[in-house]
């Protein structure tokens, strides 16, 4: 519905219809925050497969980050001389059709996990052993019940997080927010920067191709991350991704300061940012799910997704205003966010150790 409203704004000649369409789409896409919980759901995913599954999700994320800008720029370039379906409205109509087909497949083939199904490895679902008695009992009259799984009506024991677990939670939420803040900021800033810089003078088509090219070239490395995730600790993946992205930000800042920014150097910085923070975002939900009881999966996934959405929304606003506020200030804030995360990371290094995979 949001895409249809967005695409109808051109024909209706009503600017605020674009805003209304984006708001409706935002409400709809906010429900996607629940998809990551399936990467750490103990009922279907073991501890040693959660980072791998989250890496698969990031591969799809990278594919969308590449295909979306390229398709948008290509449709703008083609144009279509039509007041309803043209270079501005065609992405909205096409996405509305794609989502319609998607939901048909969901209705036909998707099966959700029963709510009453408990995770077999949930420590909160294990009942304490009962003391034995010397009094004889009639086994035929006793009800048959699995001794390790309590009735669904039994209240779960209260779990209290330790100080270390609180620290890990804050660290993972911070990196989830920072990664999506920087990715969203760069995606919204590059078209504005390219159009404002005389050396580039990008059209929407050229800006879309630039963003897509950076995403496509990171794709093989995201596949490698998927393969190595089973044999690498989450904290090492986080350290590599955040360090790569941080280095790219420092190089970009030095290029802006020296006024030596060109197409090649800008591309390498965008590539480093896209790869680094996409890789860093793979371990946030998996690390947190390994630190806390399986019964907390919904809470941990929501905490990470709220952080992702906070970063994505504020990052897009910050990136769009980057040229107006000054590119040095724009990059400086991103470096500061990563720096704060690095301090948390170093203090919690030993507490971030989890099972691989």
What kind of feature is each model-predicted range?
Residues 2, 15-32, 262-279:
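Hydrophobic core of transmembrane alpha-helices in multi-pass small-molecule transporters
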Residues 21-60:
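Cytoplasmic helix-loop-helix junction between adjacent transmembrane helices
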Residues 49-76, 307-315:
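Glycine-rich segments within core transmembrane alpha-helices of 12-TM secondary carriers
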Residues 72-73, 96-120, 345-348:
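C-terminal membrane-cytosol helix-exit motif in multi-pass small-molecule transporters
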Residues 76, 220-236, 323:
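Helix-to-loop junctions at the C-terminal end of transmembrane segments
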Residues 167-209:
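Extracytoplasmic gate region of multi-pass secondary transporters
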Residues 233-283:
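C-terminal transmembrane helical hairpin of 12-TM major facilitator-type secondary transporters
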Residues 291-326:
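A late C-terminal transmembrane helix in Major Facilitator Superfamily
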